[in-house]
């Protein structure tokens, strides 16, 4: 047997909403595959990012934030996150250095008590927090759970992230190569394109509008000469008033969303993109199980 066996495994990144889970995954991969915003509950689906290092393949799983779920959509999101705890080789519990452990963190710790995989506590945003406060956080969490490792990082600047990845590599079991080494994620490009459009809605609208929005890519066609990708997508909202906000005065907001999304999709695909957006109303879709399935939340 080799003295340095190949290691591989699945690693879930969990935490309450808006602690930097998606930012951390994008930082590790060196590419943006997961959308981000300053609003909580941006991530809705389980997304896998594949990171290859010498002697190992790490499959990171970005999850929705764990929170009190009221709508059917939110309950789906929480179940996605909880299932990612049960099915992995390692759990990264991400918290913020500038926030004391509260009720949400304790609820997650209570869930972790039933986890069979080891758990790392990853303390994010240390660049925005005084060292004394970081040490206080470490002590507070140590009293609550027997974490395998406690790792301070900044997903925003990258500080400590390489060290975290090395600790993750060492903690994984021996295993096979799950994905080809040129694969960055298991989700298709059309899914990422839809997520980019939804991200722009999150960033450019306010109040309930982002949370009432879903995006479907209706068509994704590549020209035979490879010179252009034509994408048609539908933005679904729950109210006529929300549709009006998305479209904006004389279509200005929809044009702004489409323009920003197109630029980012072109970077993703490394080609020119023609993007056409439509807006429709499906009343209370986030509470309707049939519509949730149609929109991909299953």
From Swiss-Prot:
Residue ranges occupied by any Era-type G domain in the UniProt entry: 7-174
Gene3D superfamilies tied to this protein: 3.30.300.20, P-loop containing nucleotide triphosphate hydrolases
SUPFAM superfamilies (UniProt xref): P-loop containing nucleoside triphosphate hydrolases, Prokaryotic type KH domain (KH-domain type II)
Pfam families (UniProt xref): KH_2 (PF07650), MMR_HSR1 (PF01926)
Region called G1, residue ranges: 15-22
Region (G5): 153-155
Cellular component GO terms held in the UniProt record: cytosol; plasma membrane
Entry binding sites for GTP: 15-22, 62-66, 124-127
Annotated stretches, region: G2: 41-45
Region (G3): 62-65
Domain KH type-2 positions: 205-283
InterPro entries assigned: G_ERA_dom, GTP-bd, GTPase_Era-like, KH_dom-like_a/b, KH_dom_type_2, KH_sf_prok-type, P-loop_NTPase, Small_GTP-bd
Subcellular location: Cytoplasm; Cell inner membrane
Keywords carried by this UniProt record: Cell inner membrane, Cell membrane, Cytoplasm, GTP-binding, Membrane, Nucleotide-binding, Ribosome biogenesis, RNA-binding, rRNA-binding
Gene Ontology BP term (one): ribosomal small subunit assembly
Membrane association type: Peripheral membrane protein
Region (G4): 124-127
Complexes and interactors: Monomer.
UniProt function note: An essential GTPase that binds both GDP and GTP, with rapid nucleotide exchange. Plays a role in 16S rRNA processing and 30S ribosomal subunit biogenesis and possibly also in cell cycle regulation and energy metabolism.
Family per similarity comment: Belongs to the TRAFAC class TrmE-Era-EngA-EngB-Septin-like GTPase superfamily. Era GTPase family.
Protein name (database record): GTPase Era
Species: Geobacter metallireducens (strain ATCC 53774 / DSM 7210 / GS-15)
